[in-house]
Amino acid sequence: MDDLALCEANNVPLTPMTFLKRASECYPNRTSIIYGKTRFTWPQTYDRCCRLAASLISLNISKNDVVSVMAPNTPALYEMHFAVPMAGAVLNPINTRLDATSIAAILRHAKPKILFLDRSFEALARESLHLLSSEDSNLNLPVIFIHENDFPKRASFEELDYECLIQRGEPTPSMVARMFRIQDEHDPISLNYTSGTTADPKGVVISHRGAYLCTLSAIIGWEMGTCPVYLWTLPMFHCNGWTFTWGTAARGGTSVCMRHVTAPEIYKNIEMHNVTHMCCVPTVFNILLKGNSLDLSPRSGPVHVLTGGSPPPAALVKKVQRLGFQVMHAYGQTEATGPILFCEWQDEWNRLPENQQMELKARQGISILGLADVDVKNKETQKSAPRDGKTMGEILIKGSSIMKGYLKNPKATFEAFKHGWLNTGDVGVIHPDGHVEIKDRSKDIIISGGENISSVEVENVLYKYPKVLETAVVAMPHPTWGETPCAFVVLEKSETTIKEDRVDKFQTRERNLIEYCRENLPHFMCPRKVVFLEELPKNGNGKILKPKLRDIAKGLVVEDEINVIAKEVKRPVGHFISRL
C-alpha cells in the first residue's frame, strides 16, 4: 500500500469556508441571519461574503494580511468570519470591552492592513489610533465603517463604507473558486488575543484545519441537529464565538444577531424567532433571572445553553433550568480554538437527586471528538494524576485543533507546548468517570463575567501608585460576575504610623486606589475591594503566598455599589435607584 500516494482528489485542505458554500447549495430557502428587520438567506450571505472578499482583494489584501474589526454581534462581524479568510487574509476580532491603551497594543502588535469599525466604537477607536499615531507619525491605517440605521452615514476617517464594499465587489468564477480552495490547511484563519496587556500581548494564531475540526467537534458534542436557531449572546470576538460562527453554517442554521445583551432583548428574540441554542458565560444566567414575570414563565420549547468561561454555581444552573433552559457546561481556551471539554449528560444521572445532577452539570467534562488527548499531570514529575477526583494537577491537552502558536512570541509558544502538550495553566482533577473538573488557575488568572483578567497587570498598575509598597491581586467572589479582583496592599510606613484613625485612612486609601485603577485599566479589570495589611504572607524564598490571600478573599463580600454610594453621601438607596 506504500505506493498509494496523496493527490488532489484525496487530499483537499480542510477549511470552514466550505461550510458556507455547502449551506448556500443545500439550504437555498433557509434564513441565515436575522438582525432586527434584516433577513438574509444562505445564498444571499454567500453572495455578500464573495463580494466582500473580492473587494478586499481589490484593495490589495492578500495572503496572511491581518484584517482587524471592532464590532458587536452584527451581521457584518458574522460575514467577515468568512469573507476575510476567503480573501486569503487573517481575521482579528478585537475585544471591544478593552480600553484604548489595550486596543492600541493589539493594533501595534497585529499590524493590520485595514480596520473595520462599527460606528458605536468610533470614540474608542479614535483614542486608540491617536495613541498609535503619537508613536508613529507615518501611521496610515484605513478604517472602513460599518453603519447602522440609527447612525447617520458619514465617514470621519476615510470615505470607506462596509456596504459599499459589498456592492462594488465583482467576484469572477475563477476568483470564487480560489476563495474556497486554500493551498495549505495549516494557514492562519484568525488571530485572537488572550489579553490586551501593553507589555506582552499574546496573539493566538488559529489555522483553517484547527477551526474546521473544532467546529465539527463542537456541533457534534452539543448535538445541535439540523437548522438550529442560534442566538448571539456570546461575543463573536471570544474565540470566534466558540467557533459557532462557522458552526451555524455547517448545520444550515439561523444566526439571530444582537447588539446589546439584556434580559428584554434575549427573551424577545427567543420568543419571536423560536431560538433553540445559545452560548454564554455564567454571568448571563443572572441576566436571564432578571426578566419580568412573563419572561420567567417556562419556555414552550427548550433552549439549549452552552456555558463556559468560569464554573457556574450549581444553584444558579438549577434556577435557570427551571425556566426551560437546558444547560451544558464546556471548557475551552483561545489557544485550543474553542470548546475542548463537554459535560456530556449520562442517562443514569437522571435517576440522581436534582442537587447532585446540578453538581455534575457544573463539571467541565470529557474531551471533544477532535481532541487527541486530555490529561491532568503533576507539573514537576509529569506523571498523570489518579482518577480519584481529589489529586490535583495541571490540565494538559493535545490535538489538531490546537493553535499554531503565539504571534511573534517564540518564547511563550515554546513554554505553552512543553513536553508535547498544550499546557493550559489550569489546575484540576479527573474523576473516576473520566470527567475533568477545574479547581484553580496556576497563573492566577481571574475570570470575571467570562473575561480573563491578569492579576499581574492589575498589580503593575497598583505599584505605580506613589504610596503602595507591596501588592498582590487575587480573585474574590462577586454576586454578579462570579469573580472580581481583590487587591491586598502594604502601604509605605509613612502611611501607617497613625493607628488611631487607621480605619478612616484605609477607607480613604481604598477609594483612591480603586479610582486610580479605573483611570488606568478597563473597568472590568479594576479591584472591587482593597485589603490593607502590615505585610504580605511569604515563603522562605520571599515569594508571596497567594493561596493564603485567596483563602482570605473567599470570605470577603462585595457590597452592592448603589448601597456604597448611598452610604457615602448619606442619602436613601431609592434616591439613586430612581436615577439609574
Curated annotation (Swiss-Prot):
Q: What does this protein do?
A: Benzoate--CoA ligase involved in benzoyloxyglucosinolate biosynthesis in seeds. Glucosinolates are secondary metabolites involved in pathogen and insect defense of cruciferous plants.
Q: Which CDD domains match?
A: ttLC_FACS_AEE21_like
Annotated signal sequence is: none
- What keywords does the record list, in alphabetical order? Ligase, Peroxisome, Plant defense
One Gene Ontology biological process = defense response
SUPFAM superfamilies associated with the record: Acetyl-CoA synthetase-like
Q: Return the InterPro entries for the record.
A: AMP-bd_C (IPR025110), AMP-bd_C_sf (IPR045851), AMP-dep_synth/lig_dom (IPR000873), ANL_N_sf (IPR042099)
Tell me what this protein is called.
Benzoate--CoA ligase, peroxisomal
Q: What's the name of its gene?
A: AAE20
Name the principal localization, coarsely classed.
other
Q: Where in the cell is it found?
A: Peroxisome
Q: Which organism is it from?
A: Arabidopsis thaliana
Q: What is the lineage of its organism?
A: Eukaryota, Viridiplantae, Streptophyta, Embryophyta, Tracheophyta
| EC number from the UniProt entry | 6.2.1.25
Alphabetized GO MF terms: benzoate-CoA ligase activity
Q: Please list the reactions this protein catalyses.
A: benzoate + ATP + CoA = benzoyl-CoA + AMP + diphosphate
The record's GO CC annotations read: peroxisome
Q: Where is this motif: Microbody targeting signal?
A: 578-580
- Which Pfam families does this one have? AMP-binding, AMP-binding_C
Family note: Belongs to the ATP-dependent AMP-binding enzyme family.
